[in-house]
Amino acid sequence: MPKVGSKVLLIDIGGTNIRTCTAFVGSSELHNENKEKISANTNIDDYIKSIASVETNLDHVVCSVAGPKMNDQINMTNRNYQINSQQMQSMLGVQNFYLLNDRESIGYFFNSRTEND
C-alpha cells in the first residue's frame, strides 16, 4: 500500500487526448492538471517519460488507458500504442506503475466517492 503523502502522477490516455495531473496519497486535491491532444506519430513511452521527468519526488504512477489489459499490458484499441506496466515502472524509476483499463479506473472512481461528493 502506498504511503500517505507520497506523490502520484495520474495519466489518462484516450484516443485523441492525454490528461495528466499529480496528487498525494491521502488527499483528494489534484495539482498541475493538463490536457493535450496526441498525434498518431507520438511515441507514448517518450511522452510519459517527459511528463514524469518534470515531477520531483515522484513515487507512483497510475495510468488509465483505453483498451483491454492482458498480462500487465494494454494494447490500445484506437491507437498503435502498447503500454507495459513493468517496463514503464523500470523506465521511470518509480515504486509502482499501476496500469488500468479506462473502464476499470471509472469503477475505482465511483467506489471512492461518498454521498456528499
What residue ranges belong to the model's regions?
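Short, flexible, glycine/charge-rich loop motifs used to bind or transfer phosphoryl groups or to couple energy/partner
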Residues: 1, 51-53, 87
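Short beta-strand-loop/turn "lid" adjacent to the catalytic site in phosphate-handling enzymes
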Residues: 55-99, 104-116
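Short coil-to-helix leader/linker segments, especially the first N-terminal amphipathic alpha-helix
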Residues: 1, 42, 115-117
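Short glycine-rich, Thr/Ser-proximal phosphate-binding strand/loop in the N-terminal lobe
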Residues: 3-50
